[in-house]
């Protein structure tokens, strides 16, 4: 058996052996609310979970990213970043509803991206347990602010801090039956529409900001 085949076999065995822990982590994390820009509770949970699996040097940065540098030194370049985001699109700040039905888990944001965030942590745990020796350092990242008004806050902070040191970037998101290889970016604008306004009856005929906003949205789509 080649070295590659041997590692592959160890990975498969590890994943099967630790599947119950992986599922338990999903059940727990899925209940923790994490609207964009308010991922504090999940960040703390993820840091503690990684540390419980043997990770050292785990940090929560100013953007609420949870970062575990694996075999990364101050002089490490050519880094590989593996990310799963912690925020969900739902604004809830109370514990999220969760249920299991016919072998399936149901919870707000569980597929985007709670399950994958746990998968990233399990990858890190596997690297530690199997004492994997990568050719380059790896950043395991639970990033914040991926959804909506989060505006990629966590990723922007990561690139600000590590910049050109990162040569490979993998975002684990959505379903796992496809790979997107083209760069994906986003731009956001904050638009203010100012009109005369006034009372809908007494000032009838004045320009209405809502009308123009709706017209702009219709044009975009």
Task: Name what the model sees in each region.
Residues 201-221:
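Acidic-enriched catalytic cores of C-N bond-cleaving enzymes acting on peptides and small amides
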Residues 102-111, 198-200:
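A short glycine/serine-rich beta->alpha loop
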Residues 109, 113-188:
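Acidic/histidine-rich catalytic neighborhood of metal-dependent amide-processing enzymes
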Residues 13, 179, 198-204:
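A short glycine-threonine-serine/GTX helix/turn-capping micro-motif
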Residues 28, 121-129, 215-221:
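Short glycine/serine- and small hydrophobic-enriched flexible loop segments
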Residues 87-100, 166, 181-192:
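Acidic-glycine-rich active-site phosphate/pyrophosphate-binding loop
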Residues 2-106, 129:
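Acidic/His- and Gly-rich active-site-bordering loop/insert found
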